[in-house]
Amino acid sequence: LQADKLAARSAIQGIEFSQGQLRARLQDQKMVLEQFSLKGAGAQGGEVSAQGQVVWNALNAESTSLHDVQMDLHITARGLRVSNRADRRLTVSGQVEGRMDKGQMQLTGQLSADQAQFNLPDDTTPTLGEDVVIRKTAQAPATAKATGRTLMGTPDVRVRLDLGPDFQVQGHGLMTRLAGQVTLVSSASSQGQPRLTGEVRTEGGRFKAYGQQLQIEQGLLRFNGPFDNPQLDIVALRPNLPQRVGVTVAGTALAPRIRLYADPDM
């Protein structure tokens, strides 16, 4: 089996893979994936490649159960530009192992961000007024709950991500570089929903509050649950003052608490 010029694109997500190649061979009840590769966007978009095999262990030739399928897959990313959107750029390297046995899919590995730039949406983005109501023309048919469950069951995922040396974030008054490691976990116990564990720190940067540009002195984001709602522990101070004056940010990303700060008390 062989295929060339494979591609995958999504303008909404900023995904643009091309120049793909596939080389595989069938051997009895086994398919050996000798080569699979895709290039990332642009001249320096990097590459993702995979090798492995899929074995069909069914005794009955008419069986279609995934419990009869065993898969081992090794995936390598080398400077792969995963997203190329203007407000979301991400390049990663690392390795991921995929395995399926008795209908259960497992993904483990470690990735490192070579470069990232995330621009958070501005608070002034236009939205519909509260008096605007959108009514559906027809009720969509009932479907399974929106979890990570698939025909292969709920995937068991554990992938560690190192934010690397150049992970930039800007928006909501914040401009900083993030550093640290987090682990992406998804399993049946979380109903397939992705969760993050780990701690991320800010490295310098600025935070705008009450019309003032403040320097971030301390910034910690602690993840232990949903990826979009870490615990916040941030101290940002006005520069070039004899007294430490600024704000503290506590709570969570979805419910932050911003308070004035002074040391010593004013």
Spans of features found by a protein language model:
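Strand-loop-strand
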Residues: 4-266
